[in-house]
């Protein structure tokens, strides 16, 4: 489906510095491991490059800080809509934030899921973030792979459609 890429010094970052997210039109493949960025910050920066965006988020779980970040981006006009797919078990563990989550996200689907992927489909371009980080706050090193390759975003969209068929939908 897509060819492996070579990591160059420009793509590799250390945890000593906060990674810089480049415009995916100029750097179509970006990879870094860091404890200096959160997933919500990456989404925020990508919307600068994509324009107002629709989000499709897959995560094992989400936390209040991440949900509030998405809410803030919606209020700023950076996000048109956001859909969330996350795991049944995680939903039970994060029950106290479920009301906030279902208010912020256009649709929330529960299913068996451990993937952590975000599609940022903007007016100017579409980007996909593959990450080890859930939509939670953490201080651990996490891996992030950002690409604007359309076949990857399309694959994620198709997979989400299949997952929706096996889920419980909490908002329409």
Residue ranges and their predicted role:
Residues 1-172:
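PLD/PLD-like phosphodiesterase catalytic module centered on the HKD motif
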């Amino acid at each position: 489906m897509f060819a492996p890429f070579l990591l160059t010094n420009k793509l590799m970052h250390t945890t000593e510095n906060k990674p810089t997210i480049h415009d995916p039109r100029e750097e179509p493949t970006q990879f870094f491991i860091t404890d200096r960025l959160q997933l919500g910050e990456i989404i925020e920066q990508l919307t600068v490059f994509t324009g107002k965006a629709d989000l499709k988020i897959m995560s094992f779980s989400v936390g209040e800080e991440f949900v509030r970040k998405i809410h803030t981006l919606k209020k700023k006009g950076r996000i048109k809509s956001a859909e969330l797919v996350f795991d049944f078990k995680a939903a039970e563990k994060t029950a106290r934030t479920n009301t906030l989550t279902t208010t912020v996200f256009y649709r929330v689907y529960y299913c068996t899921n451990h993937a952590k992927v975000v599609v940022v489909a903007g007016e100017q371009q579409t980007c996909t973030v593959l990450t080890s980080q859930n939509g939670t706050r953490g201080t651990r090193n996490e891996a992030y792979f950002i690409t604007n390759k359309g076949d990857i975003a399309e694959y994620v969209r198709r997979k989400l459609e299949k997952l929706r068929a096996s889920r419980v939908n909490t908002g329409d």
